[in-house]
Structure formats: structure tokens, C-alpha cells
Design a protein with these regions (language model features):
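Acidic, Mg2+-coordinating catalytic module of metal-dependent nucleases/exonucleases
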Residues: 130-137, 141-142, 146-147, 177-238
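Short, function-defining helix-loop hinge/capping sites that tune catalysis or transport
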Residues: 45-47, 101, 142, 147, ...
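Acidic active-site catalytic centers that drive phospho-/nucleotidyl reactions
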Residues: 37-39, 139, 164, 200
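Conserved non-catalytic scaffold segment of RNase H-like nuclease domains
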Residues: 2-5, 13-134, 238
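Hydrophobic positions within alpha-helical membrane elements
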Residues: 42-44, 98, 140, 169, ...
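Histidine/lysine/aspartate-rich catalytic loop segments that bind and position anionic ligands
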Residues: 147-152, 156-171
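Active-site-proximal helix-loop-helix substrate-binding element of RNase H-like nuclease domains
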Residues: 76-92, 96-99, 163-202
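Amphipathic alpha-helical interface surfaces
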Residues: 109-113, 139-146, 161-164, 174-178
Length: 238
């Protein structure tokens, strides 16, 4: 039997009093970056079960640098009629029937994950959340499929736009594999923890912040502070 891994059912949300600086709304054109990682029982979001999901809301410090917030994560019960590919379980080392998994339904999982994200979108003055992920369309596809199956209302994520750390890592470091990209960014990587949703989400969040912050060091023009469209003063500098 597979051992139970990290990411028991829990959620850590921001306090009502905690406000992410509004600068992040200008930085990404009204989008709030939220890292999401899913662990699944296969590649097909319509057929294969969603087993684990984790999210990390990105926030901006007063100096304009990004940092991850506390993670939100839970194990998920396979939906009725879903398929389980043994090869996927061998890869992510999840036992869907483990007695200590404390998994919850897709409906409850979406409520637990997406409600704090909606609150963060509102508190930052953003219009929508944008999913950040490593091969982000895979994660977005499973989130959207779960939303459709459950009839979940008010999904905060943009329906197709993403920030993909595969592309960003290839641009910044010449690497596309998450572990190699993280190491190239100077981040610690523990192979034994990989392929749990919470670990991969936390590491992807650190990587995304490292890339954006590094870019800020290379090009210190803080264009998001230069007016409502964020680009006006940049063109005026030419």
C-alpha cells in the first residue's frame, strides 16, 4: 500500500484584515496570480479523478517584490464514475483508498480552495485570478472540469489565460523541468517531496516569484506604478 504523503485536508486563508498591496493589480493588468498544482489519476480531466489540489496566492510587498502566501490544500475524493490509471498512481504515489487521506468531495474542495482566492481578488482590487502553474493548462483543465461537474458558481480564474513557469523558466534559465528550473533559480529541491500538490505548488510559487523579482532587478522600471494602463510612461521615456 502506498504511504500517505503531505497535504492533509486543510486550508490557510488570509485574515479579513490582511490586505495584499494594490500594486499587484497594476502589475498584472488586473489579474491576481495564483499558483495551482493538481495531482490526478490520469491525464484526461473529463475521465480521470482529481485526487489532490493545492493553491498559493501571490502577493506583493511594499517594495514591489512578490512573495507566496500560505498554501491552501486538500485531498479530493474521486468523482463518481471516474477512472484511475495505475500508472498515474505509481508516479504520484497517492493511494486513493488510504484511511488517513481525509479526502473531501470535489464540491467541498472547490469551496475550500476557491473561496479564499475570490476574497483575495476582491481585496487586491483585481478583476480575475490567473492560474500560475508548471504546464499550467493541465492544472487549469482539471480545475475547470471539476467546476463543470459540480456546477460550482463564480470560478475566479480566467477561463484560458495562464502564466506557465515552463515558458518563464525556459526564458530566464534555459530550463523547462520544474526541479531543474527551481535549482537554476537557487531554490532548494527535495525529490522525495515532489509530486505532492502542496510541495509542487509551493515550489512553483517560489519559482514564479523568483523569476518576476529577478526581472525587476534586470529592468527596474516599475511600469505598474505609472498610471492606469501601466505602460504610458514607458513609451514616453523612449
Amino acid at each position: 500500500m502506498f504511504g500517505i504523503r503531505r497535504a492533509p485536508t486543510y486550508a490557510v486563508a488570509m485574515n479579513d484584515e490582511e490586505q495584499i498591496p494594490d500594486g499587484i493589480a497594476q502589475r498584472f493588468r488586473g489579474f491576481l496570480p495564483v499558483v495551482v498544482d493538481v495531482e490526478t489519476a490520469g491525464f484526461d480531466a473529463q475521465r480521470h479523478a482529481l485526487l489532490e489540489i493545492a493553491a498559493v496566492i501571490i502577493r506583493m510587498k511594499p517594495d514591489g517584490r512578490l512573495e507566496p502566501s500560505a498554501p491552501i490544500a486538500c485531498h479530493v475524493l474521486p468523482f463518481v464514475g471516474s477512472e484511475i490509471d495505475p500508472r498515474a498512481l505509481a508516479f504520484n504515489r497517492i493511494d486513493p483508498d488510504h484511511p488517513f487521506r481525509d479526502a473531501i468531495s470535489e464540491q467541498d474542495a472547490l469551496t475550500r480552495i476557491l473561496t479564499p482566492i475570490r476574497k483575495a481578488v476582491k481585496s487586491t482590487g483585481c478583476n480575475r485570478a490567473i492560474l500560475v502553474g508548471h504546464n499550467a493548462h493541465f492544472d487549469l483543465g482539471f480545475v475547470k472540469a471539476a467546476v463543470e461537474r459540480t456546477g460550482f458558481k463564480r470560478n475566479p480564474f480566467h477561463s484560458f489565460s495562464v502564466f506557465d513557469t515552463v515558458t518563464l523558466g525556459g526564458l530566464m534559465f534555459g530550463q523547462t523541468v520544474l526541479a531543474k528550473t527551481a535549482r537554476a533559480a537557487g531554490l532548494y529541491w527535495q525529490n522525495s517531496e515532489a509530486h505532492s500538490a502542496i510541495y509542487d505548488a509551493e515550489q512553483t510559487a517560489r519559482l514564479f516569484c523568483a523569476i518576476v523579482n529577478r526581472w525587476g532587478e534586470l529592468d527596474p522600471v516599475r511600469f505598474w506604478e505609472n498610471g492606469p494602463d501601466g505602460m504610458t510612461s514607458m513609451s514616453q521615456q523612449d
